[in-house]
């Protein structure tokens, strides 16, 4: 990535709109075909992931989320309320260039097409003592704006440290040792409303999730909600902040037209998750590998088990994305969407 000046000097091209020289060193989508064989190495991720979200694209298996804090063999499903479970037949280890799978069908079904979204945080991390609750582990990557936090809830107003050094704009919470709904904070909704990742519902008033207090550059406020701060229960929060040229959480208004709304991000997205916050609809997930060309970018739903869906959905552009459908989950006229 070099260029030459008028006097023939060779200089490195710096992309002014990005603070991360190589975004694929912090997030990458990996596709593979399962073989139902133990100790199958999935390589080419480009880094050792600290969070891996897997979905079997060919079947109606659950989504499976793994991270370095809970341990590689423990999975939890975004589409369900079931508790964190150990699945030794699924993901076996996080490796320097990817991960290893055993023979389980959700991640390695024979002949089945599977996707894994990979994020780099900071390994297992360590306890963060910035808040009134000392976290068990905070795995924070200040470069990519990704932090994974585990802590024990108190059931009363409290704070926890996220370690990012900048304000999180999107946070997914879960009481993971018991059956429970997922709770999602999004900056465009404010701290007194939330969404549920496992459900289709619109935004809802929720003053007890974050105690109606927006996150700061160091702390997340918690209220008494069992979804974010259940007394005596292990909790987890996956936190993301905006990073110029790499990640962004925002909102847009649908226009109900196949020549849909254009959403400016300032960079070409590699992963998009959308929710209609105005009314009931599925969540929607896209990436730059399934199919990887416009307009046929495949669709998955994090709130249900539906297999990969093909169709005319959206364009991934150099500076954002553009909707190409009038579906309620993406471009209903006048509806507000979070991404």
Put a short name on every predicted segment.
Residues 2-4, 10-339:
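Surface-exposed molecular-recognition determinants
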């Amino acid at each position: 990535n070099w260029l030459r000046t008028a006097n023939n000097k060779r200089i490195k091209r710096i992309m002014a709109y990005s603070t991360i020289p190589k975004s694929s060193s912090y997030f990458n989508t990996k596709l593979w075909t399962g073989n139902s064989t133990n100790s199958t190495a999935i390589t080419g991720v480009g880094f050792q992931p600290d969070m891996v979200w897997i979905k079997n694209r060919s079947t109606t298996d659950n989504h499976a989320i793994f991270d370095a804090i809970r341990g590689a063999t423990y999975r939890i499903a975004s589409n369900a309320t079931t508790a964190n479970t150990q699945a030794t037949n699924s993901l076996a280890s996080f490796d320097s260039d990817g991960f290893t799978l055993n023979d389980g069908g959700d991640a390695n079904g024979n002949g089945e097409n599977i996707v894994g979204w990979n994020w780099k945080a900071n390994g297992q991390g360590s306890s963060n003592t910035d808040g009134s609750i000392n976290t068990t582990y905070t795995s924070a990557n200040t470069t990519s704006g990704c932090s994974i936090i585990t802590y024990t809830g108190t059931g009363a107003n409290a704070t926890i440290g996220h370690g990012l050094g900048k304000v999180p704009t999107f946070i997914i919470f879960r009481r993971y040792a018991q059956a429970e709904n997922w709770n999602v904070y999004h900056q465009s909704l404010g701290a007194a409303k939330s969404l549920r990742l496992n459900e289709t519902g619109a935004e809802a008033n929720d003053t007890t999730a974050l105690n109606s207090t927006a996150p700061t550059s160091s702390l997340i406020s918690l209220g008494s909600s069992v979804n974010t701060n259940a007394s005596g229960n292990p909790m987890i929060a996956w936190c993301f902040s905006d990073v110029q040229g790499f990640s962004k959480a925002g909102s847009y208004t649908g226009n109900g037209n196949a020549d849909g709304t254009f959403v400016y991000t300032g960079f070409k997205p590699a992963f998009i998750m959308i929710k209609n916050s105005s009314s009931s609809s599925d969540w929607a997930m896209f990436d730059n590998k399934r199919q990887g060309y416009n307009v046929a970018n495949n669709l998955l739903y994090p709130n249900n088990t539906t297999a990969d869906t093909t169709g005319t959905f959206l364009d991934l552009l150099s500076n954002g994305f553009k909707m190409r459908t009038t579906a309620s989950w993406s471009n209903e006229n006048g509806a507000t969407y979070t991404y």
